[in-house]
Amino acid sequence: MEVKGEIYRVSGPVVTVTGLQAKMYDLVKVGDEGLMGEVIQILGPKTIIQVYEETAGIKPGEPCYSTGSSLSVELGPGLLSSIYDGVQRPLHVLLERTGGFIGRGVTADGLDHKKLWEFKPVAKKGDSVKGGDVIGVVQETVNIEHKIMVPPDISGTISDIKSGNFTVVDTICTLTDGTELQMMQKWPVRRPRPVRTKLTPTRPLVTGMRILDGLFPVAKGGTAAIPGPFGSGKTVTQQSLAKWSDTEIVVYIGCGERGNEMADVLSEFPELEDPQTGRPLMERTVLIANTSNMPVAAREASVYTGITIAEYFRDMGLDVSLMADSTSRWAEAMREISSRLEEMPGEEGYPAYLSARLAEFYERAGVAESLCGETGSITVIGAVSPPGGDFSEPVTQNTLRIVKVFWALDAKLSQRRHFPAINWLNSYSLYKDSLNDWFADNVAPDYVPLRERAMEMLQTESELQEIVQLVGSDALPDDQQLLLEITRMLREIFLQQNAFHPVDAYSPFAQQYRILKAIMKWGDAAMEALKSGVPVPEILKLESKNVLAKVKYEEKFDESMNAVLTQMDKEFASLRGR
């Protein structure tokens, strides 16, 4: 007979129940409507539950049932191109059942249990298999071959394996001990999926954004944070990363952000082409939409749901990038739940375990050798929304302690319409040194020295700007006036990028290198001309400088760049010939 509890108290999304036999993090059905909730605290006879749906109308005395299992996600063919809410309910299914607004107590399977997939076995009868071993494949999209793996906690010898078209819940393989395997497996979201070993990240995540790839690269399997005030471009940067990063799978979590931003993603991604494969971007994307008007408790679930789906694809040997926009909203949800539980508040009202929860999430990133011997990676990029752009607040500070790349968005840059508004003086990447060999081998041997020179120049420019604001640029020596012009070119030509331009939105490494080298070449030639006696105003009149600024928008980039370099050589030769 099913044991049921009784609601004792309701406080927003937190419900206290008596008489319920449940374990920590068990999934429960709350009230007459059967709202989905999760056990977060057990105090003697009382069980405290956070409810993932609106609790209006629930009253003391209503029943509460434990499912006996923790919050889990369904993993298998059909994940790609899906759009879920925070607890892996497909939004298109909820739309059919309840209309434009999500009804309460509605349950839906994470994967389509009726759709047929063609299963091709790679294991055979008599094979000994263990957790993580691949027993077959399904061609899920044109480019992604979905590997069907044995769940991590199962092992045995195959007594029967089938081939053909099956649903995700059909038995496709039977072990000698009677265990039946399906294409789908369930996994608790709070439990990291096991791996054989973790590895050191050695390859960069190519984002197509010059300031990120060039100055502050993140490694595949790395962690990065994008903190910034409102309107500084966090979401556009995150969306650009989701569109153009060179990973095979993208998991995008809209955690507590505006509904319109998720609507933008939903309308844009199906129409955009993946630059690596030429296929629609949606084919490699899983979207988790948990907007600001959805119940706060589900924000935590959405983050864990997203990282668990990412781990599943990593186990197949794929490179995954996960965008969480924004982790601050998740932290605010934790603060609200914590205050409802009447826990002792920490700094600025956040719970004392804030840093532990953030670390728990970011540490699930990394490069790993999976149980089946494949090497995959998860790169986690979390947006942080500090109120008023104050980077000293707890969420930003705790995130900074964990992540190795910090892309600091600056309100002043965004007000000057400099996008991406990443402040090159405040940002840093701790992966730079470990990726230098990759850049030297795959881009150009002189790429790293060029980058270091550019950073030194930008640093010097910031020091000179203080003098310029006091006495004006005319008071500076000629070489420093010229340096200011070179750094202006670096800022406007190399660092600035238009995320909505058909050509400039994505800049390949070869293109980035040529633009940077051309600016440095112009700067070196200008300094040489200055030493030979040419006045600064004459150098600044050269047309090649203006033409170079337009090259990044040209579809025939190499032709245009070659023409500019030829023009540059001619102009400087004529200057020296005077």
Swiss-Prot record:
Q: Where is ATP bound in this sequence? A: G228, P229, F230, G231, S232, G233, K234, T235
User: How is this protein situated with respect to the membrane?
Assistant: Peripheral membrane protein
GO CC term, one of those recorded: proton-transporting two-sector ATPase complex, catalytic domain
Pfam families found in the cross-reference section: ATP-synt_ab, ATP-synt_ab_N, ATP-synt_ab_Xtn, ATP-synt_VA_C
Does the record's keyword annotation contain Translocase? yes
Listed under subunit, the entry gives: Has multiple subunits with at least A(3), B(3), C, D, E, F, H, I and proteolipid K(x).
Q: In UniProt terms, what function does this protein have?
A: Component of the A-type ATP synthase that produces ATP from ADP in the presence of a proton gradient across the membrane. The A chain is the catalytic subunit.
Q: What is this protein called?
A: A-type ATP synthase subunit A
What organism does the UniProt record list as the source? Methanosarcina barkeri (strain Fusaro / DSM 804)
Taxonomic classification: Archaea, Methanobacteriati, Methanobacteriota, Stenosarchaea group, Methanomicrobia
Identify the gene encoding this protein. Answer: atpA
